[in-house]
Amino acid sequence: GLSTNQQIIVAKVINNTIKRGWMFYAVLLPEHSVNSYLQTAEGDFVFDPYINVNKPVALHGFKENESVIISYYNDVFPAAAPAFSEGLARVSAAIKPDSIFTLANGQLTSFTKKGLYLVQKDTTTVEGFAFRVEDGYPKFKHIQDLVGPFVYVCAKDEYDRLRMAGNDKKQFDKSVLAITRDTDRAREFMKTYFSRAEVANHLFTSYKEGWKTDRGMTYLIYGAPTAVYKFADREVWSYGKTDFSFSKSSTLFDPDNYVLIRNKKYAAEWYEKVDLIRNSRF
């Protein structure tokens, strides 16, 4: 349930054709009460927690001509640990910005460096909002960008060969073929697996890329759940007889951050899913 100091925002969506309605809600946390936002040069609101490099945007929601502080982090965050793992892919509790600069409210600017950006009026508080800057996101623009999501379905030596291929497409394709052992399977694997990865980037981008998050990883391996149950403090994804619980763990960088409750019981089915994916059986 909600605590006394929490509020929720509710949206009701009605499809008149089929005469059905859905209710969606989000918990508004006082410690993350930020009214600022990004807007494109064309005046469109940026609803996603990411933008692409060299895309002109402006910060709004502050006082006119008020300067705000932007902290830039170029950390490479780890991919999620498997659902059966006892150890988490932990991130340092305190990450240090690579650089800090200021922008005025409404000032149009383009971010040229990929990474994580945190917007704050006062760096001594725990208020602000963050977004990622990527290239060609949520798609995978370069061959080397494709390597990361393989970490969930590859042995270490296979992953190393993919990484060493650089942007050499011929070597990359050869490494993928060594995993799937069939040209048609390789083609289907790339199409379906990276379609899932793109969706994960779009839906689950946090302080790190969507495919690296716990929910993104689960989506990559299991696909879309048959049902999602949302509670104030957690989400439960149902796949028939298998359920995954994600505990809400809000941070300054991502108020909507969720952490998978891991358990050894998932190991056997997880390996079965990975084996099916490697054989392009989705």
Where on the chain are the PLM-derived regions?
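Second-shell loop/turn segments in exported
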Residues: 146-150, 158-164, 199-208
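Aromatic sugar-binding surface patches on proteins
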Residues: 1, 89-111
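A cross-family detector of function-defining hotspots
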Residues: 169, 178-211, 217-258, 269, ...
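Short, aromatic- and glycine-rich surface loops/edge beta-strands on solvent-exposed regions
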Residues: 3-17, 112-125
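Short beta-strand elements
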Residues: 15-45, 125-152
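Extracellular ectodomain segments of secreted/surface proteins
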Residues: 23-86
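Conserved, structured regulatory domains from eukaryotic proteins
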Residues: 258-264
